UniProtKB/Swiss-Prot annotation:
GO terms, molecular function: GTP binding; GTPase activity; translation elongation factor activity
Name of the protein this chain belongs to: Elongation factor G
GO cellular component, one term: cytoplasm
InterPro entries: EFG_II, EFG_III, EFG_III/V, EFG_IV, EFG_V, EFG_V-like, EFTu-like_2, G_TR_CS
Keywords for this protein: Cytoplasm, Elongation factor, GTP-binding, Nucleotide-binding, Protein biosynthesis
Residues annotated as binding GTP: 19-26, 83-87, 137-140
Source superkingdom: Bacteria
Residue span, tr-type G domain: 10-284
Length: 691
C-alpha cells in the first residue's frame, strides 16, 4: 500500500557520505541506518510503521548500501543518503551524485588524517559547491589523533575546520564526547551506543572545553553581527544563535564543522546525525537550479511542490524484483504515481507506473514525490541518466544535464564459450543502459564486439560485473585508443558501378565533391542533384553506401569523420539501375575521395587535471611534457597545486601508477575527453607501420 507523507521542505536533507576507501564510510552509513531504524521501532515517526530489524542482518552479512539513495529519519527530519563512489575512474558516478545532493559528510580516519583519496573527494565537493561537515572516525584506534585531522585539513585541503567536539579518553580508552558548543559531555553505558548518558564535563577536560567554546564563539561572530556585539560586550550568545551562525558559515562554504567518534564502536553517530540536521542545508538553503527553455532562454527552477514538475534522472539500475529503476530528484512540482511525464531531453512521453522509496532493507511504495525529494520510478523505458522529466502540461524546460564525457578507450571482448554469445550481448546492453559512459559496438571489418569506456579500471570493473552479476566469462583484448581519420583538402571524384553482361545488369554512377569540416562536425551530406539525373529514390542508397564505407578509413581502418559530401551529378540506366548499384557506387566514390584527400589520423586529446603537493610539481610537469602534453595553466588549491594540461590519450596509459610513484601516493588526477586533433607526422607513420 502506498503511503502519503506529511511534507516540509525545511525538514529534508539530501546528503552524501564521502570518504577515502578505508576511512569507514560503509560502517558509518550502516550505523546511521541502524539508529534511524531504531526510531522506527520505537515508533516516533509514523510513516509506514516500518520495522527495520537491522542487527540480525548486520550480523549475517554486514550490509552495504547498494541503492543509489536510501531514506531514513532523525528528529522529525527525513534524510536521503546518496551513495557516492570512492574511485576516480567513475567521475561520472561522482558527478551524478554531487549533482543531486545538497550537503555531505566527509569521513576521515583519525589515525591517518587527510589521505590522497580524501583530497580527491574534497576537491570534487568544492567544484560543485557542496557544503560539508567532517567526521573524524576510528577515534578508538591506536594512533587516533583529532589534531592530526584538523592539521591535515588545514594543510592539505586549505579548509577552515571548526572543532565542535573533544574526545574523552584516547585510543582504546576513548569513552565519551564533549560538545563544546553546548558545553555538555556524553558517555556510553553499553556497546550498542544506544545508552547515551549526559554528564557534566569531567574536571580534567574543563579548561580545554572552555578554550574551544571560546574559539567557536569567535568563529560564529564572523557570520552573525548580533553575536559579534554580544562577544565584544562579554555576553554569552544563546545555543540557538550559535547553531544558526555555524549553520550559515557551513552553508556559505566558509567553514567545516568537525565531529568525532567511532562508528564501529557505535560512539558519536547520533551526535553526527544531530549535526546533519543542525548544519547541513535543506533544499531551500541552496541556490535554485537552472534550466533552458526550447527557445534557449535560461530559467531558474525553485523547489516549490506546487510549481510545474521538473525532475532529473541521475541513475538507472536493474533490480531483480521490479525491473528497471530510474532514480530521480524532483526539483520542482510533484510527481505522482500513475501519471504521464514528458522527457524533454528525448522528446518522448513516458508513464510513471510506480514510485518507490528505498529504505536500507526494504522498499516502500509511495503515491508522490515532491520538490526536493529523491526516489525511484518504475516503468520508464526511454529515460537515461541526465534526462529531464517535466509534467505533461508543464513548460518544456531542460535541466543542466549531467555532463557525459565521450568514452575514449576501446577493448575487444568475446565470450569464452560460443554458447555465451547471446548472454554476453544482453548483459552488455543492460550495462550500457545503466552507465552512459560505457558503449558497445561492432568492429566493421573484424566483426568483433568492442566495448568502450572512460579508462582501464572502468572496463575492468565492467568485465568483473559480467562475471559476477550475469555469469558470463569473457576474454578481453588489450586496450586501444579510439582513433579517427579525416581528409585535409577538398576533392572531386566519380564512382561508377557498371556490370552489363547477359541478363539484368547493374548500373550506378555518381559524382561527389568531398570537403574537410572543422573538428567535431561529424558528417554532412548534401543532395545537389537537379533535373533528375539520378532519380530521387536512389539518393538515400548513395548516402547509405557513403556512410557505411566511412566506418573504416584507408590509413588504419578507423572511422572517417568531419567531412562534407555533396552529390552533384551522375547518371542512371532505365533497366539496370538499382538501389544496390547506387549504394556500391557511393561507397567506391568515397573510398577514392578519402585516399586522394591527403588523409590524416586524429587522436583523442584529454583534458587532464593533476593535483599534487607543491614539492613534486617540477617532476609532474616534466612528465606531462614528455607525454606530448600541452600545459594550460596552474592554480593553487588549498596547499596543493592543480596543473591543467591537454595530453593525448595514447600517452596516458599507466599514468595513475607513474603519478603515484612520482608523488609518493599524494598526487591524484582526473581526465576527461576534450577534442580530437591531428597526430604529428612521426606518430602517424608509426601507427601505419604498426598495422
Amino acid at each position: 500500500m502506498a503511503v502519503k507523507v506529511e511534507y516540509d521542505l525545511k525538514r529534508l536533507r539530501n546528503i552524501g557520505i564521502a570518504a577515502h576507501i578505508d576511512a569507514g564510510k560503509t560502517t558509518t552509513t550502516e550505523r546511521i541506518l541502524y539508529y534511524t531504524g531504531r526510531i522506527h521501532k520505537i515508533g516516533e515517526v509514523h510513516e509506514g510503521a516500518a520495522t527495520m530489524d537491522f542487527m540480525e542482518q548486520e550480523r549475517e552479512r554486514g550490509i552495504t548500501i547498494t541503492a543509489a539513495v536510501t531514506t531514513c529519519f532523525w528528529k522529525d527530519h527525513r534524510i536521503n543518503i546518496i551513495d557516492t563512489p570512492g574511485h576516480v575512474d567513475f567521475t561520472i558516478e561522482v558527478e551524478r551524485s554531487m549533482r543531486v545532493l545538497d550537503g555531505a559528510i566527509v569521513v576521515f580516519d583519525s589515525s591517518q588524517g587527510v589521505e590522497p583519496q580524501s583530497e580527491t573527494v574534497w576537491r570534487q565537493a568544492e567544484k560543485y559547491h557542496v557544503p560539508r561537515i567532517a567526521f573524524a572516525n576510528k577515534m578508538d584506534k591506536t594512533g587516533a589523533d583529532l589534531w592530526l585531522v584538523i592539521r591535515t585539513m588545514q594543510e592539505r585541503l586549505g579548509a577552515r575546520p571548526v572543532v565542535m567536539q573533544l574526545p574523552i579518553g584516547r585510543e582504546d580508552t576513548f569513552s565519551g564526547i564533549i560538545d563544546v558548543l553546548r558545553m555538555k559531555a556524553y558517555t556510553y553505558g553499553n556497546d550498542l551506543g544506544t545508552d547515551i548518558r549526559e554528564i557534566p564535563i569531567p574536571e580534567e577536560y574543563l579548561d580545554q572545553a572552555r578554550e574551544y567554546h571560546e574559539k567557536l564563539v569567535e568563529v560564529a561572530a564572523d557570520f552573525d553581527e548580533h553575536i559579534m556585539l554580544k562577544y565584544l560586550e562579554g555576553e554569552e550568545p544563546t545555543e540557538e544563535e550559535l547553531v544558526a551562525a555555524i549553520r550559515k558559515g557551513t552553508i556559505d562554504l566558509k567553514i567545516t564543522p568537525v565531529f568525532l567518534g567511532s562508528a564501529l564502536k557505535n560512539k558519536g553517530v547520533q551526535l553526527l546525525l544531530d549535526a546533519v540536521v543542525d548544519y547541513l542545508p535543506s533544499p531551500l538553503d541552496i541556490p535554485p537550479i537552472k534550466g533552458t527553455t526550447p527557445e534557449g532562454e535560461v530559467v531558474e527552477i525553485h523547489p516549490d511542490p506546487n510549481g510545474p514538475l521538473a525532475a532529473l534522472a541521475f541513475k538507472i539500475m536493474a533490480d531483480p524484483y521490479v525491473g528497471r529503476l530510474t532514480f530521480i530528484r524532483v526539483y520542482s512540482g510533484t510527481l505522482t504515481s500513475g501519471s504521464y511525464v514528458y522527457n524533454t531531453t528525448k522528446g518522448r512521453k513516458e508513464r510513471v507506473a510506480r514510485l518507490l522509496r528505498m529504505h536500507a532493507n526494504h522498499r516502500e511504495e509511495v503515491e508522490e514525490l515532491k520538490a526536493g525529494d529523491l526516489g525511484a520510478v518504475v516503468g520508464l523505458k526511454e529515460t537515461i541518466t541526465g534526462d529531464t522529466l517535466v509534467g505533461e502540461d508543464a513548460p518544456r524546460v531542460i535541466l543542466e544535464s549531467i555532463e557525459v564525457p565521450e568514452p575514449v578507450i576501446d577493448v575487444a571482448i568475446e565470450p569464452k564459450t560460443k554458447a555465451d554469445q547471446e548472454k554476453l550481448s544482453q548483459a552488455l546492453a543492460r550495462l550500457a543502459e545503466e552507465d552512459p559512459t560505457f558503449r558497445v559496438s561492432t568492429h566493421p571489418e573484424t566483426g568483433q564486439t568492442i566495448i568502450s569506456g572512460m579508462g582501464e579500471l572502468h572496463l575492468e570493473i565492467i568485465v568483473d560485473r559480467l562475471k559476477r552479476e550475469f555469469k558470463v566469462d569473457a576474454n578481453v583484448g588489450k586496450p586501444q585508443v579510439a582513433y579517427r581519420e579525416t581528409i585535409t583538402k577538398p576533392v572531386d571524384v566519380e564512382g561508377k558501378f557498371i556490370r552489363q553482361t547477359g541478363g539484368r545488369g547493374q548500373y550506378g554512377h555518381v559524382k561527389i565533391k568531398v570537403e574537410p569540416l572543422p573538428r567535431g562536425s561529424g558528417f554532412e551530406f548534401v543532395n545537389a542533384i537537379v533535373g533528375g539525373v539520378i532519380p530521387k529514390e536512389y539518393i538515400p542508397a548513395v548516402q547509405k553506401g557513403i556512410e557505411e564505407a566511412m566506418q573504416s578509413g584507408p590509413l588504419i581502418g578507423f572511422p572517417v569523420v568531419d567531412i562534407k559530401v555533396t552529390l552533384y551529378d551522375g547518371s542512371y540506366h532505365e533497366v539496370d539501375s538499382s538501389e544496390m548499384a547506387f549504394k556500391i557506387a557511393g561507397s567506391m566514390a568515397i573510398k577514392e575521395a578519402v585516399q586522394k584527400g591527403d588523409p590524416v589520423i586524429l587522436e583523442p586529446i584529454m583534458r587532464v587535471e593533476v593535483t599534487t603537493p607543491e614539492e613534486y610539481m617540477g617532476d609532474v610537469i616534466g612528465d606531462l611534457n614528455a607525454r606530448r602534453g600541452q600545459i594550460l595553466g596552474m592554480e593553487p588549491r588549498g596547499n596543493a597545486q592543480v596543473i591543467r594540461a591537454f595530453v593525448p590519450l595514447a600517452e596516458m596509459f599507466g599514468y595513475a601508477t607513474d603519478l603515484r610513484s612520482k608523488t609518493q601516493g599524494r598526487g591524484s588526477f582526473v581526465m576527461f575527453f576534450d577534442h580530437y586533433q591531428e597526430v604529428p607526422k612521426q606518430v602517424q607513420e608509426k601507427l601505419i607501420k604498426g598495422q
